[in-house]
Design a protein with these regions (language model features):
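Bacterial Sec-dependent N-terminal signal peptides
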Residues: 1-22
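Extracellular/oxidizing-compartment recognition motifs
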Residues: 21-275
Length: 275
């Protein structure tokens, strides 16, 4: 009986740690972006004494990439979002201490919508820790942040529209001046979902193989590439000599060329089964 009680307590404890209520969580969103727009968010957090230890707790109803001082904090292609049954919002707590650079930290998030509900709960983020004197600090995503529509849009499941002419390579930079950026607003979505802490049990998406096409066939409709096997991932196309504004389609995605010497055309938030 004692063994059963201990096991029951452990299960209950795991459940409490794994899920928490959304009550009190602050959500922000772009004030004017459409439901298909991907969004850049950013904020500089300053302290009087150099920061020594820090964590970020972040959640979104979409998929996202998280950067601290210009560096991607995880090796995954993206993080997020609502689980497949749309009953929980995934939340992550990440130790970002190794990315700290003194008294100022630049946090940047690239958000992409995925929710079928069209929620404007685009980002919830808390940044907290202690400085070199042991003094705690805390900041959260709120109206003091900056936001801007990104250079891509998510038009539907497995479908991204990418416009390289609108890409700003400094969007997550520590040097960017946010002259043409906007302030975000609080979410108007009143529906609450439990937050699922995905940090302890999270199995990240990892790139395991890089495949090259084994055959290609060109006709009047375009070029078909055969990779010789089925795979779960995405296609990256290297373009050379493409003119700015030229448009191409690959799979269900569209791409507007930026006119760079070597361009990489690929979806940032879409992984599909292909051959």
């Amino acid at each position: 009986m004692r063994r059963f009680a201990t096991l029951l307590s452990l299960i209950c404890l795991c459940a409490i740690q794994g899920f928490s209520q959304e009550w009190g969580t602050r959500w922000i969103c772009h004030p004017q972006a459409s439901d298909t727009a991907q969004v850049w968010f950013r904020k500089r957090v300053k302290t009087t004494t150099p920061q020594e230890k820090a964590f970020i707790t972040v959640a979104s109803t979409g998929r996202f990439r998280l950067y601290v001082n210009e560096r991607n904090v995880v090796t995954d292609p993206f993080l997020g979002a609502i689980d497949s049954l749309e009953k929980h919002i995934k939340q992550y707590t990440i130790d970002v201490s190794r990315f700290l650079e003194g008294r100022e930290t630049t946090i940047a998030v690239w958000y992409a919508p995925t929710s079928k509900r069209g929620s404007d709960k685009q980002l919830s983020l808390e940044f907290y820790g202690k400085d070199q004197r042991g003094k705690p600090f805390y900041a959260q995503a709120d109206g003091s942040w900056f936001c801007k529509e990104a250079s891509s849009a998510t038009l539907g499941p497995g479908q991204e529209a990418i416009n390289a002419t609108r890409y700003d390579k400094l969007w997550h930079s520590t040097e960017l001046k946010e002259k043409d950026w906007q302030r975000p607003m609080d979410s108007a979505d009143t529906l609450t979902l439990p937050l699922q802490d995905s940090s302890p049990l999270y199995q990240g998406i990892r790139m395991s193989h890089v495949l090259s096409a084994v055959d290609e066939v060109a006709d009047s409709t375009g070029v078909t590439f055969d990779f010789g096997r089925s795979f779960h991932g995405w296609v990256r196309i290297t373009l050379r000599g493409a003119k700015k504004g030229e448009r191409l389609c690959f799979g269900d995605h569209s791409y507007v060329c930026g006119g760079q010497m070597d361009e990489q055309a690929f979806p940032r938030f879409t992984i599909t089964k292909q051959r």
